[in-house]
Amino acid sequence: MALTSEISPYNPQWPLLFTAENRRIAEGFGAELIGTHHIGSTAVPGLSAKPEIDILVVVSEHINEVARSEFMRTLGYVRGTDLSAGHHFYRRDVDGVRTHKIHVCVAGHGQIARMLRF
């Protein structure tokens, strides 16, 4: 499992990396997409963090998980174990280093508020 272990000084490119990745993944969610959020340490201006872009995707429901997972695979993502009912997880590693983590939650899931409070 590839993980980033180093904490890096804040990088002003992190919000831009979120925006670029957000555009890449949005089409894979179609009509079920409600919204996306840059979450985690890289979303906090000025905060040192592991350089992994965390994205929360809120959906109305998990309509076609197989098609979505295939789309995400074409972007270099691997679907991990569901973190709970209604909370799917994808990760992207480049050259053995974790670069992105995507949490896909059904609207109303308790983890949404927790992740947005960070």
Range-by-range predicted roles:
Residues P9-P12, S41, G46-A49, R92, ...:
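Generic structural "secondary-structure junction" signal
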Residues L75-G110:
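Conserved catalytic core of two-metal-ion nucleotidyltransferases
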Residues M1-H37:
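Helical scaffold of the NTase/Pol beta-like nucleotidyltransferase catalytic core
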Residues G110-F118:
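Catalytic cores of NTP-dependent nucleotidyl/adenyl transfer enzymes across multiple folds
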